[in-house]
Amino acid sequence: MVEKKPNLTLEFHDYLALKKVLFDWADSYDAKDWDRLRSIIAPTLTVDYRQIGLRKWDDMPAEDYMAMISDMDFLGDPTVKTQHLLGESWWEKISDTEVIGHHQLRAAHQVYTDSTLQTVKLKGHGHATNEHYYRKVDGVWKFAGLKPTVRWNEYQFEDVFRAAKPSV
């Protein structure tokens, strides 16, 4: 069987616009800048979180995505600090309005005991490759979803978001 080769042809201005969306995605997560994140996402997203214990949503409305990401039990918790560090990427053109980005990612997480951010409660870092989906909406590239593939985790990654919740 002959493997189909990906279409690697992108116009340079599209490449630069996609790189900016990628940077804004990661940095808005880390800065908890929900307005910036909202400005770069498509009206609907494909979110495949099966590898991290959740489910797949094929047509998640933008506001549902924003609510999930910014929730106090997820990235919205002020005691959870992150850095989504991007490694190498390659880009697959699906059509003039759709691109899949393949990105190496290290997501460092630290959970603090309280909002003073003085004492680290635990840390957990994820190492993954992500498929990011990009869609051109009204002539502008938007983030349209993701599918992480976890390679390995460090420390107590599985406890990061549970640990941020008050003990019962």
Swiss-Prot record:
The active site is at H84, H109. It comes from the Eukaryota. GO terms for molecular function: scytalone dehydratase activity. Pathway: Pigment biosynthesis; melanin biosynthesis. Keywords: Conidiation, Endosome, Lyase, Sporulation. Substrate binds at Y29, Y49, N130. Scytalone dehydratase; part of the gene cluster that mediates the biosynthesis of dihydroxynaphthalene (DHN)-melanin, a bluish-green pigment and a structural component of the conidial wall. The first step of the pathway is the production of the heptaketide naphtopyrone YWA1 by the polyketide synthase alb1 though condensation of acetyl-CoA with malonyl-CoA. The naphtopyrone YWA1 is then converted to the pentaketide 1,3,6,8-tetrahydroxynaphthalene (1,3,6,8-THN) by the heptaketide hydrolyase ayg1 though chain-length shortening. Homotrimer. Each subunit contains an active site, located in the central part of the hydrophobic core of the monomer, which functions independently. This is Scytalone dehydratase arp1.
